[in-house]
Amino acid sequence: MLVKSSAAPVRTAGRPRDERVDRDVLEATRQLLVEVGYPALTIDAIARRANVSRPAIYRRWRSKAQLVHEAVYPADEDQTFHLPETGDFAADLGTIITSTLEVFSRPEVLAAVPGLLAEQRDDPELRNLLARRLEADARAEFAAFVERAVARGEARSGLRGDVLFDAFVGAALFRVAAGPDEVDLPAYADQLTELLVHATRLPDGENHP
């Protein structure tokens, strides 16, 4: 999948954490995101649902956005960027696209991402967290994956892995931020894969009509 574990979550200094409180707060945040959405989500509501105090939350997370970020992309979840490498570029690209769409289509992620993307514009720390979480080493690893496909003759010469990366990640983010509520995810992934595979195989110098 594309999302990769980033550095440890940012928390303010203080006494050792009660891991039970962490778990309860993160679970309450995920539940409320799905129930009320990001704009209506409040720290007070999370505290009530988790049966903890507001100060207990703010000792761990500096803002609602940073709490939501960790709730939807847990630091202890295996989010390593796994690249399938079967030697079949089209099949492997389809697997990567499908797994990326699956991550972005989780109910709590669908509820959180538009708000996080809006907030990160004025929050450099959150922007850095999101950049590390959404990319980390994935961009470089994907570019190397594309280079190997080019070397095998499965993709056209001169194909830029970073552009292909932006194409399907951008499609996944748009699907989350502005797409319809109900999407046939497997069909969407198949059509996106077909479109991008076709683009990777265009002969040099040939223009798309």
Each predicted region: which residue ranges?
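Short amphipathic alpha-helical segment with a characteristic S/N-K-E followed by hydrophobic residues
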Residues: 40, 63-68, 77-79, 93
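Basic, helix-initiating cap at the start of DNA-binding domains
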Residues: 1-49, 55, 65-66
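Amphipathic alpha-helical packing segments from all-alpha helical-bundle domains
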Residues: 107, 111-114, 124-151, 161
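Short, structured helix-loop boundary elements
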Residues: 22, 43, 65, 86, ...
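Hydrophobic alpha-helical connector segments
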Residues: 80-113
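Helix-loop "lid/cap" segments that line or gate small-molecule binding pockets
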Residues: 98-104, 113-122, 193-200
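C-terminal peripheral helix-coil segments that are non-catalytic and often amphipathic
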Residues: 1-10, 95, 136, 140, ...
